[in-house]
Amino acid sequence: MSRIKRNAVSMACLLALLAACGGSGSDPDVKAGGATPTLLAGSVVTTQEPLVSASRIAGGMAAQEATAGAIPVLLAPSEARSRELSGTVPTAPGVTLAGASRLLSQASMGATMYDIQQVAIKGMVPWLNEQFAMPQLMHRWYIDNAMRKAGVGGWGTQDQFYESFWQQVCTGQDQLRQRVAFGLSQIFVVSFVDDNLGSSGRMMGGYYDMLGKNAFGNFRTLLDDVAHHPAMAIYLSFLRNKMETETRVPDENFARELMQLMTIGLYELNQDGTEKLKNGKPIETYTHDDVAGLAKVFTGWSWAGHDKSNARFFGTIEDPWRDWLPLQNYPNFHSTSTKQVLGRPLTATTAEGELKEALDRLFNHPNVGPFIGRQLIQRMVTSNPSPAYVSRVAAAFNNNGSGVRGDMKAVIKAILLDDEARRPGANAGGRVREPVLRQANWMRAFYASSVSGKYTMWSMDDPVRGLGQSVLRAPSVFNFYRPGYAPPGTALESADMVAPELQIASEPAVVGYLNTMKNAIYNGMGRNYDIRTGYVKELAIVADEDKLVDRLNLLLMAGQMTPTTRAHIRNAVRSIQMPAAWNTDPADISYRRTNRVYLAVYLTMASPEYIIQQ
């Protein structure tokens, strides 16, 4: 066993060096009050879900549109596992299994062997188009049903959101939407860490649903929905924001961050993302007068409802659906003075008109394509895209080929199908996999399922006892890490390169990751180890170390494991001898077989080659 320990320590040290340098038993729930359908794997259920239309509240009850959609089945992990093909897999022209796995590392929450085979068989573009056409399953439906089943009211809990989130990660077939929504959640940040949102599971679930809904839509609609969502209004403090007086100015928080972090950034950019210069200095995109003007646009906005009374504005009337319906404007509290945005006064004469004009102005700013495009590249493909890569993605944002600006499908295709994304070694070092994705990778790669059917997972943002990151629990509006972060005093900084995710890769976090994943691999994750995997496919080949390592290499590293790492892992696995033919002790046989798998998975996920997504 000493060799095993030496290898494990070796991998841990390498990871620390990197940080230093650098089937489901649950039925899918539908809307509250509706029947929970019994679903068979591969089937589709259709339901009616009321969604608020783009036309906002114009007095009276919020206008709603009933949108019918086919809900994708939450494919049971055991069913996905059973669909794996054995033997030679027929692949589409120009696609390899390793290439398919690499696409999934960028475009999903994690690869399964079944998914790898499907991408390889169908081809990358057909798979992307299939993902674009796949309907969305809402977290809010799950939370509503969870409260209904428990016989309680209220606003939902964090735990209920995480149950829904991890259920969708493990079993949802809409993997591209989930990955893009996760990326958007790190640009349009709201957080459970805020005391005012910590007990608002349904509101936050609805916000995440909104990001997912817009993941394949238009960026302009996304801006509108973010600006009207109560979670953002609470988080960046413009809910119940009142017009200016002689002694009071409107809250400027959201106005500032909407420009700085969510649309145009601090400095004017060329299409390739490089800064424009004037007299050798960067050119600021906005002034404080613009912040003050935009802040006045966000006055008078508060809860949706049947009327626009003062009581409803201040929230003393608590309608049961106000936590997810879009805000409405209350003229009694809206500023009527002149509002300057990006150097020019707004011309609209109503609150709704002013907001539309302001968002149009931001949306049409030439910075948006490169500013947002670069961040989405960082969240999916590489931390250091070349200027040419950024320019190509920005061009797709500016015009999808049919004269449409802000088409997210065009942007996503431009990101994922670019040569720098598809050609190994072309993307300047890839990116560090953030902890949430490592956790999701493990769950999906080994077909993890929930014992209870609820996927009871709490937040994992404690860096010592967890993974140092949980979705929707960023410490501030600046996310878990900044897009331009480089570890100080390192070769990365000297090379003018960035590694955003290393901002949370402290020494305790590195050790916490190793300990947490070791425990997960051996025992499972979540409350009472509710989320577990049987490693069925891995145990079937456990006697052949080469086949076992080959499978892990394809699943977790897209075939990019180096010969040195491969030899380390293979030798460590080999040091645990397979049970002899005469061994009839079932406990010893199981121990030897399972520990060979556990060790192989652990060392693979501890290796720097896995931590760095190439």
Located regions from the model:
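Sec-dependent bacterial lipoprotein signal peptides
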Residues: M1-A19
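Flexible, low-complexity segments enriched for small/polar residues
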Residues: S101-S108, K149-A150, F188, H365-G369, ...
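Amphipathic interfacial helices
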Residues: Q160-F161, T171-R179
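Hydrophobic alpha-helical membrane-insertion signals
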Residues: G94-M147
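Bacterial Sec-dependent N-terminal signal peptides
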Residues: C13, L18-A41, Q48, V52, ...
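Short, contiguous, well-structured surface segments enriched in hydrophobic/aromatic residues
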Residues: D174-R177, F188-V193
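Active-site substrate-binding loop specific to GH73 endo-beta-N-acetylglucosaminidase modules
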Residues: S55, G60-A63, L74-S82, I116, ...
